[in-house]
Swiss-Prot record:
Protein family per UniProt: Belongs to the IPP transferase family.
Gene Ontology annotations of biological process type: tRNA modification
EC class name: transferase
GO molecular function, one term: tRNA dimethylallyltransferase activity
Subunit structure: Monomer.
Annotated organism of origin: Escherichia coli O127:H6 (strain E2348/69 / EPEC)
Region of interest: Interaction with substrate tRNA: 42-45, 166-170, 247-252, 280-287
Function: Catalyzes the transfer of a dimethylallyl group onto the adenine at position 37 in tRNAs that read codons beginning with uridine, leading to the formation of N6-(dimethylallyl)adenosine (i(6)A).
Entry keyword annotation includes ATP-binding: yes
Protein name: tRNA dimethylallyltransferase
Binding site for substrate: T19, A20, S21, G22, K23, T24
Cofactor: Mg(2+)
Keyword set, alphabetical order: ATP-binding, Magnesium, Nucleotide-binding, Transferase, tRNA processing
Binding site for ATP: G17, P18, T19, A20, S21, G22, K23, T24
């Protein structure tokens, strides 16, 4: 698409970044100044009843800056990148029709990628193939299957943990059904996003600062009642660790504690470590992202001003 064609497209803003980087605070600040409406891009914030452990914006924040695509699924339900793209495009069209600008904020990089580039069609699940994979896992262990994935699709294997059976199984299933790797298929773009997008990433300049913020926030969540929140989910009886909701960072570790698998101190340690690993993966995604403008979260006023400088012309 030519620059002239792009300039004629409606405008949108992406505000991306690792967990605990200050994305929400900046987005709320920007809404006070720019004619924007916020759309959440977060695979955990979609779930109802999962507020503390996901650092969901609180009532006051949502009154100041309503977020779309929050609380749209029960924790028992699945939600795919394709679901997100469909829903986000509908919300973006609604915002644009009202004469405002969509500001998409979050840290689920796969959702941003799906929205920006489109999705290639993946083969539907095959119960027979899935059963064969699960049988092999029962006999040889998921570590063995992870090594198998590493041989055929090292890129996906680097992204998928051996202790993530659902994603590991799906990656192998796609290969067995189609003969093509998940990486090959997901790199085949579908329909590109019909918007002129200004992309920003916010993070502390120092990784150590981000690690400190992650640890502080995890302890703040615990002090705010995170354990009680997960106990309520645990008590439902219909939720389990094969669900994407319960595999969310923090929830998986608290679940293990409630099941008596680990001590409280071990839960805290694992929760902090898992959150740091998530942040590392998010930053790795962003380092390879094209056309992104980096912001320093330790200088919030400067970050705000940089966004305004880049996108200020579109606010008129």
């Amino acid at each position: 698409m030519s620059d002239i064609s792009k300039a004629s497209l409606p405008k949108a803003i992406f505000l991306m970044g690792p967990t605990a980087s200050g994305k929400t605070a900046l987005a709320i600040e920007l809404r006070k100044i720019l004619p924007v409406e916020l759309i959440s891009v977060d695979s955990a914030l979609i779930y109802k009843g999962m507020d503390i452990g996901t650092a969901k914006p609180n009532v006051e924040e949502l009154l100041a800056a309503p977020h779309r695509l929050l609380d749209i699924r029960d924790p028992s339900q699945a939600y795919s990148a394709a679901d997100f793209r469909r829903d986000a495009l509908a919300e973006m069209a609604d915002i644009t029709a009202a004469g405002r600008i969509p500001l998409l904020v979050g840290g689920t990089m796969l959702y941003f990628k799906a929205l920006l580039e489109g999705l290639s069609p993946l083969p539907s699940a095959d119960p027979e193939v899935r059963a064969r994979i699960e049988q092999q896992a029962a006999e040889q262990g998921w570590e063995s299957l992870h090594r198998q994935l590493q041989e055929v699709d090292p890129v996906a294997a680097a992204r998928i943990h051996p202790n993530d059976p659902q994603r590991l199984s799906r990656a192998l299933e796609v290969f067995f059904i189609s003969g093509k790797t998940l990486t090959e298929l997901t790199q085949t773009s579908g329909d590109a996003l019909p918007y002129q997008v200004h992309q920003f990433a916010i993070a502390p300049a120092s990784r150590e600062l981000l690690h400190q913020r992650i640890e502080q926030r995890f302890h703040q969540m615990l002090a705010s009642g995170f354990e009680a929140e997960v106990r309520a989910l645990f008590a439902r009886g219909d939720l389990h660790t094969d669900l994407p909701s319960i595999r969310c960072v923090g929830y998986r570790q608290m679940w293990s504690y409630l099941e008596g698998e680990i001590s409280y101190d071990e839960m805290v340690y694992r929760g902090v470590c898992a959150t740091r690993q998530l942040a590392k993966r998010q930053i790795t995604w962003l380092r390879g992202w094209e056309g992104v403008h980096w912001l320093d979260s330790e200088k919030p006023e400067q970050a705000r001003d940089e966004v305004l400088q880049v996108v200020g012309a579109i606010a008129g």
